[in-house]
Amino acid sequence: MPTKAVFRTARLGAGLAVGLLALAACTPAGVVVGGAASAGVAASEERGIKGAADDAVIRVKINEAWVKEDFDTFIRLNLQIYEGRVLVSGRVPDQAQADKAVQAAWQPDGVREVINEIEISEGGGLNDFANDTLINARLDADLLFDGDVDSINYSTRAVAGTVYLLGVAQDRAELDRVFRIARDVPNVKRVISHVIMKDDPRRIANPGNGGNSGG
């Protein structure tokens, strides 16, 4: 059975692969390297390569629908997707815009759940954006280098100081640790978790091995 040290090495390798992917993306050879790195990262996740690919398709289709409906919606909202579970967060000025965004999020094949965390507000401007960017960067780093967290199975996003968590936890202890790490990041106001356990029946059976579409 793999040890924690092995898992930690795999997570760090996945993180380095993401960094190499970003650096290599500007060259023709980088396309090949990037594809291999992406596949390596996806293979390390609970959802597997197929699950990650399905989620990527869902993301593209929702973003396309938002842009087509109203570009303002696209730039105001955030998407987190894991195994077909879609979390929509951000701020829009009216309820009608929020309703349309959620409706569009349900449309792609493979979407199994849409979690609506949209706030009706004009938004906080550049200060909130800068603060959220710092929170996201700090939280990503803290999770990546924590030896007791399989960070690759989590999606995190800060909106106006609120951190939203999505993904799959190995157990309750790991999720509690992720929650504490997020809460302790400077300027985080609250943490909202939509993470499910590895053995949760809502998960797709064998997501990395050709289960139901939805990733």
Model-derived segments and their meaning:
Residues 2-11, 25-215:
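N-terminal targeting leaders
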Residues 13-24:
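Bacterial N-terminal signal peptides
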